[in-house]
Amino acid sequence: MITVGIDVGGSATKIAAFREDGRLMSPLFVRATDPVTSVYGALGRFTAENNVRLEDIHSIMVTGAGGAYVGEELYGRPCVHVSEFESVGRGGLYLSELNRAIVVSMGTGTALVYAQSGEKSEYLGGTGVGGGTLVGLSRLLLGMEDLSHVADMALSGDLSHVDLMVSDITRRGDKLGLRQDMTAANFGKVSDIASKADLSLGLFNMVFETIGMLSLFAARSKGVRDVVLTGRLSVIEPAAKIFENLNNMFDLNLVVPFHSQFGTVIGAALTGMERTENRI
C-alpha cells in the first residue's frame, strides 16, 4: 500500500508518497489558482505517472493553508489532516538525515520550526518576508512577476550598486567583530546607475539575509548549528551563494537537501507512514 502526502498551497499543490517498504516516490507539484482543482489535478497526475491504482493508496495526509478545502476523502480514499509545522519539521529532518535542527519553510512567507527526532516539532515563529515579498517588490521595482526570470537576471547583478556595506561606513569593522563585506543596510546605497540586475540581486539578498538572520537567532536560542532550508525558495538560483556567505560569516550550517522544495509534503506523508506502522 502507498501513503500519500498532499501540501495545498496558495498557488501550487505538492504531492509525495511512500511505498510500504519506505521508499520515497518521485514528488511533483501542480500549479492552479483554485486549491480544489489543484488537489484533484495533483492526485490524478500522480496516479497516472506512477501507474498507481486508487485502491493501492492506503491514506492521504493533507497539510498546507489550502488543506481546509479538502474533505474527509479524495476519490474515495480517506484523508487525514496533519499539522503543517509538524510536517515541516519531520520533512526537514528526513531529507537532511539530521537528528536535531532548525527547519525553515521558505514559501510565500517564512516559518521556523525546531525539530528533534522522536519529539513533537516546535513552531518558533516566522516572518511575512518570503516569496510573496519577492513577487510584490519585483512587480513594483522591475515590472516583472516571473521569479525565475528575476532570479536569472540577479545572477549578473552587483550588490555594491544597491546595498550599504560595513566597508562603506568604517575600515575598522574587524575590531568591532564585523566583516567588511557584511550588509549594513539593504538598499541603503542605491546608485543612480543601478541596473535591473543589480536591483534583482538586492531583492534576493534582502529576503534571504532576513531569513538567514532569523534562522541564526533561532538556532542560537536552541543551541544548534544545523539549519535545514526547505520550500520552493530554497532552490531558486541566487539562494546558494547568499546562504553560503552567511555560513562563512557565522557559525552556522545552513543545509539545502535534495528535494528541499518538497520538505513539508514529504513530512506529511511520513506522518501517515508512522501512523500505519503504529497500528501494525
Tell where the protein language model's regions lie, with residue ranges.
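Conserved phosphate-binding catalytic cores of ATP/NTP-utilizing and phosphoryl-transfer enzymes
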Residues: 70-104, 109, 113-119, 266-272
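Adenine-nucleotide phosphate-binding core of ATP-dependent small-molecule kinases
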Residues: 176-226, 261
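Short beta-strand-loop/turn "lid" adjacent to the catalytic site in phosphate-handling enzymes
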Residues: 29-32, 47-84, 96, 120-123
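Glycine-rich phosphate-binding loop plus the immediately following alpha-helix
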Residues: 119-174
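Glycine-rich phosphate-binding loops at beta-strand->alpha-helix junctions
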Residues: 62-70, 217-246, 261
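Glycine-rich phosphate-binding/hydrolytic loop that grips phosphoryl groups
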Residues: 90-95, 134-138, 254-280
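Conserved phosphate-binding/catalytic loops in two-lobed NTP-binding clefts
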Residues: 79-85, 244-267
